[in-house]
């Protein structure tokens, strides 16, 4: 019969999750005992950096990635980075060591009290399995949920004495062999109606959000902008680090001001606002004003049902962003609308003494590979 440890690593292997980022302590060492030769462990010295590396790794690979943290202190240190991973829609699967089961009730040293509550509200799922035998299924649950739209971080608390427990091989294999797919396209009727609204608009504009990048839909968003001569703003204050449209493109307009009044003022000359891959909107600070000018309508495309439900105005299509844009492009032809004025691109940052951060980032941007995160 396999142990919990053996079944768990078989599960990770089946899901292609053979790179683990972590900063372990004593409660995590039993999990790492007999660490498989085909796995890599990327050690960090602070938990926020560890989760940040995993977040970037998930963005590059498009797959769920493992993070290994040390009970309550490690999870607490990582919370800011977990917030960013949530904003980036990154499928980060966090395992957190827990005290031995016989010691939890006494709240012995290193017990993670209320472990499930600690990471909320910045994870999609937090769980501590009731039995050692449930560990592989709990981890599979977390992995699949992290990977379903909208992707995001999850956490499983794992007691340190679970790993050598033997479990039923057949039941474990059923869990290991499962595959879950969650990409769903938009209702074709809604896509056709949206295409007609874009076609009929006199002066439409687009707002690009981070879910475009998360869905791998940059090319589709660029094609839509060029096919319909849409200027493209970046959604304001989304958190995280993803961009939905290249800042070097001539249709780029910049980043929307994040407050209610300024957003409405910025978009007032447009009769249709198409928001793709973003909430509507992450407003801040509190500068009142009309959400939209009279005569301006808004349509949102998002994979996140909560983003769609909480928007204060406009219509919403909840579906995979890439699939929806692909279907929308098939409904549209090259517009005769005039192209927006070309964006000249960012100006060169002047050298200062002391040196400023913008100059450093500009120099780094010129040197790093194009596929760097």
Describe each PLM feature range.
Residues 96-138, 238-344:
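Glycine-rich, acidic loop regions that bind phosphate or pyrophosphate groups
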Residues 18-55, 97, 186-187, 195-273, ...:
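Anionic-ligand anchoring segments at beta-strand to alpha-helix junctions in alpha/beta enzyme folds, i.e.
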Residues 160-189, 339:
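Aromatic-enriched
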Residues 36-37, 82-85, 143-145, 171-173, ...:
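Short, solvent-exposed amphipathic alpha-helical segments in soluble enzyme
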Residues 31-32, 53, 77-79, 104-105, ...:
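Short glycine-/acidic-enriched loop or helix-start segments at secondary-structure transitions
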Residues 5-18, 23-26, 31-33, 342-373:
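Active-site diphosphate/adenylate-binding microenvironment
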Residues 26-27, 70-74, 98-100, 160-161, ...:
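Short glycine-rich anion-binding loops that position phosphate/pyrophosphate groups of nucleotides
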Residues 1, 16-19, 59-94, 120-173, ...:
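Structural signature of the thiamine diphosphate
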């Amino acid at each position: 019969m396999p142990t919990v440890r053996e079944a768990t690593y078989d599960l990770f292997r089946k899901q292609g999750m053979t790179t683990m980022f972590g900063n372990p302590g004593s409660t995590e060492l039993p999990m790492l005992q007999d660490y498989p030769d085909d796995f890599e462990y990327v050690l960090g010295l602070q938990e926020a950096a560890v989760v940040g590396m995993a977040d970037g790794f998930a963005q590059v690979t498009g797959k769920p990635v493992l993070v290994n943290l040390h009970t309550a202190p490690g999870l607490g240190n990582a919370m800011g980075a977990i917030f960013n991973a949530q904003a980036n829609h990154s499928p980060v699967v966090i395992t957190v060591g827990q005290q031995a089961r016989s010691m939890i009730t006494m709240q012995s040293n290193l017990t993670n009290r209320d472990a499930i509550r600690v990471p909320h509200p910045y994870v999609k799922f937090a769980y501590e399995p009731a039995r050692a035998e449930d560990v592989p299924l709990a981890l599979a649950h977390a992995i699949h949920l992290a990977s379903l739209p909208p992707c995001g971080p999850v956490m499983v608390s794992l007691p340190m004495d679970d790993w050598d427990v033997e479990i039923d091989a057949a039941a474990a294999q059923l869990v290991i062999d499962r595959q879950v797919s969650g990409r769903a396209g938009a209702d074709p009727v809604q896509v056709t109606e949206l295409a007609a609204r874009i076609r009929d608009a006199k002066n439409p504009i687009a707002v690009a959000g981070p879910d475009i990048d998360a869905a791998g839909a940059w090319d589709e968003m660029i094609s839509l902008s060029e096919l319909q001569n849409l200027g493209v703003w970046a959604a304001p204050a989304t958190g995280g680090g993803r961009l939905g449209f290249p800042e070097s493109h001539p249709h780029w307009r910049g980043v929307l001001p994040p407050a209610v009044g300024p957003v409405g003022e910025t978009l007032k000359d447009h009769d249709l606002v198409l928001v793709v891959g973003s909430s509507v909107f992450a407003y801040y600070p509190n500068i009142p004003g009309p959400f939209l000018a009279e005569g301006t309508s808004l349509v949102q495309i998002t994979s996140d049902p909560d983003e769609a439900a909480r928007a204060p105005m406009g219509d919403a299509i909840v579906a995979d962003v890439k699939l929806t844009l692909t279907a929308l492009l098939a409904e549209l032809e090259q517009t005769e609308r005039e192209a927006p004025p070309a964006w000249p691109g960012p100006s060169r940052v002047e050298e200062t003494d002391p040196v400023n951060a913008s100059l450093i980032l500009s120099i780094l941007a010129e040197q790093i590979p194009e596929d760097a995160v």
